[in-house]
Amino acid sequence: MHTVLYSNMKNMFQLLSFLCVSLLVAGDVHHHAACSTVCSLKGILDSVSDLTDLAKERLATLQNPICSKDKAFYMETYTNVTQNKAEKNGLPINCATVYQQGNRTSGIYMIWPLFLNHPISVFCDMETAGGGWTVIQRRGDFGQPIQNFYQTWESYKNGFGNLTKEFWLGNDIIFVLTNQDSVVLRVDLEDFEGGRRYAEAVEFLVRSEIELYKMSFKTYKGDAGDSLSQHNNMPFTTKDRDNDKWEKNCAEAYKGGWWYNACHHSNLNGMYLRGPHEESAVGVNWYQWRGHNYSLKVSEMKIRPIIFVPGEGLPK
């Protein structure tokens, strides 16, 4: 019985590993979710009451080659293919490599991230803290009309707005950008009185749509006050997709799309209300700096690889 059970588990893991590898080679943006599913099955199977100690030990030996060795091999293969494809077109994979190519002017550039089968336009910040930042969100006072951030799941998935003004780059793209490198998220904030603050989240990661664009990071630093940790390990919520911990929908209540908990200490995709506002927590809020009744003038969210050296670029 033990042998049959082990054989069945081995065959199942081999099948799932093949699926994972196929997605990697195809460049499917959900490949990380598929592989994490393979890995997480160990925990599920461990909970089965009739799983013997012998089967557990053998299953543990299977986990490493399937979820680490094989995945690493095919990830390296696919990465090399994609990099060669991008290099043939002269396109960098993010704004850090745009910087590495000698560009020092902030603006719109074309990049070709790994795991995407097409290039995209992004705004690169080449000035803040040494440059090399790929901007994923911006709020600001750009006059009329004001960009509406009270959007649907599909809109946040694909992105919206104007790269030279207010925009959300898109959860699918953010997923790709945060999975091709280990990155730091920087949030730059400004109020209407001229005050400025920043926050950084190290090892910032957004998972795939299958995992509801769950966000996580390891450590926080900055002078804005920590309004991110409450949202750590939370999935994304919009007015039409409620994934938060509140009995109601945080996005619907606070007029945005965000990694709401129950509900928020930051709401950078809230309503653009220009300073103090009466209705609590519906604006572009950063609670640990200006509270729930002050909507900020500027918010910029940007990412770059952790290994980037300010003023020097990426290690050669």
Curated annotation (Swiss-Prot):
Disulfide bonds join 95-124, 250-263. Keywords: Calcium, Disulfide bond, Glycoprotein, Lectin, Metal-binding, Secreted, Signal. One of its GO terms (cellular component) is fibrinogen complex. Its main location: secreted. The record marks 254, 264, 281 as: Implicated in ligand binding. Hemocytes. It holds the Pfam family Fibrinogen_C. InterPro entries: FIB_ANG-like, Fibrinogen-like_C, Fibrinogen_a/b/g_C_1, Fibrinogen_a/b/g_C_dom, Fibrinogen_CS. Residues 86-307 form the Fibrinogen C-terminal domain. One of its GO terms (biological process) is fibrinolysis. Transmembrane segments: none annotated. GO terms for molecular function: carbohydrate binding; extracellular matrix structural constituent; metal ion binding; protein-macromolecule adaptor activity. It is found in: Secreted. Glycans are attached at residues 80, 103, 162, 293. Residues 1-27 form the signal peptide. Ca(2+) binds at residue 242. Lectin involved in innate immunity. Agglutinates all types of human erythrocytes, Gram-positive and Gram-negative bacteria. Has a stronger agglutinating activity towards Gram-negative bacteria than towards Gram-positive bacteria. Specifically recognizes acetyl group-containing substances on agglutinated cells. The hemagglutinating activity was inhibited by EDTA, acetyl group-containing mono- and disaccharides, N-acetyl derivatives of amino acids, other acetyl group-containing substances, propionamide and benzamide. NCBIfam families: GGGWT_bact (NF040941). Tetramer. This is Techylectin-5B. It comes from Tachypleus tridentatus. The lineage of its organism: Eukaryota, Metazoa, Ecdysozoa, Arthropoda, Chelicerata.
